[in-house]
Amino acid sequence: MTDLAELVDHVIGVDPDRDRVTAAVVSVTTQGELAAATFPATRRGYGQALRWAKTLTVDERRAWAIESTGSYGAGLAATLAEKGEFVIEFDHPSTRASKDGAKSDSLDAVRAARETLGRKTWATPRSRGLREGLRTLIVARDSAKLARVAAINVL
C-alpha cells in the first residue's frame, strides 16, 4: 500500500458533532497543525469548510480524515466526495488522550489527521445507497416502537 505522505501534502482531520464540524489542517512533512476551525453541520457549513481548507492548502494534494462517516460525518463526507476530494474514514481513534482528560473537538480533529498519517492502510467511507436507506427505516421503526410503548404506559 502506498504511504499517504506520498499522495498528499496536507491532511485535514475532522471531528463532527450533531451541530458542528471541527476541522484541523496538519502538514504531512512536519505533522504540525496549521489551523483549526469550526463550521455548522449544514450543507452551507460544509462548503465553508472546503473553501477554508482550499485557502490553507493551495495545492490539490490534500486528504480529509473524517470520524463517524456513518453518522455525524456522513453529510460532510458525501459533500466532499461530490466535489472530488480525497476522503478517508477515520475509524478506531486512539482513546488514550481523552482518558487523560485532554478532550476537545480541535484536539480530536488534529489527532484524526495525525493518526491517519501514521497508518499504512485507510478506508473510504461507505456509499449512502440502499444501506443508508435501510438504516433510516430501522431508526424510524425503533423510534415508533418507543413512542408506542410510551403512549401505552401513559394510559
Where do the protein language model's features map onto the residues?
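Phosphate- and other anionic-substrate recognition elements at nucleic-acid/protein interfaces
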Residues: 1-155
